[in-house]
Regions:
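Local sequence-structure signature of Cys/Sec-based thiol-disulfide redox active-site neighborhoods
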Residues: 3-38
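Pocket-edge positions in alpha/beta enzyme catalytic cores
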Residues: 16, 51, 86-89
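Thiol-based oxidoreductase modules, predominantly thioredoxin-like and allied folds used
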Residues: 39-53
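Short glycine-biased active-site loop of nucleotidyltransferases that positions the nucleotide triphosphate
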Residues: 55-58
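Structural micro-motif
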Residues: 60-69
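Non-catalytic, surface beta->alpha helical segment in thiol-disulfide oxidoreductase systems
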Residues: 68-106
Length: 106
C-alpha cells in the first residue's frame, strides 16, 4: 500500500500575532477549530518579541496574518523548504482557511 499524495504533503500554517489583540484571539480560535478537523503543521510568531523584529517591521500593524504554505522539502536536520505563502489578513473564517489550504495543496 502506498501513501496518498495528501499524506506525503505537509501544509504549514504560521500565525503572526501579538498580545492584547482580540482579532488575534479570534484567529487562534479559528485555526484551533480547523486543526481538530484536518492535520497541518502550525506555529505562532509574536511580532512584538525582540528576536522577531523582521516580522514586526512587516506586520506590526496588520496582525493577525496567517501564512499558508506547502512544505516542499524537509531536510534531515529539520529545516523546511516552503512554497510562497498564501496570506490571510485580519478577519478570516474557518472555511476561508480551509479553502486556502486546499489551494496550496494543489
Amino acid at each position: 500500500m502506498y501513501p496518498t499524495r495528501r499524506l506525503l504533503q505537509s501544509t504549514r500554517l504560521t500565525l503572526f500575532t501579538r498580545i492584547n489583540c482580540s482579532l488575534c484571539d479570534t484567529a487562534k480560535y479559528t485555526v484551533k477549530n480547523l486543526r481538530e478537523k484536518r492535520p497541518f503543521l502550525y506555529s505562532e510568531i509574536d511580532v512584538m518579541v525582540p528576536q522577531n523584529k523582521t516580522w514586526k517591521d512587516i506586520y506590526e500593524f496588520d496582525v493577525p496574518v496567517l501564512h499558508v504554505q506547502r512544505v516542499m522539502f524537509k531536510s534531515s536536520d529539520g529545516r523546511e523548504t516552503l512554497s510562497d505563502p498564501k496570506k490571510l489578513f485580519h478577519r478570516f473564517t474557518e472555511q476561508e482557511v480551509e479553502n486556502t489550504i486546499k489551494e496550496v495543496e494543489e
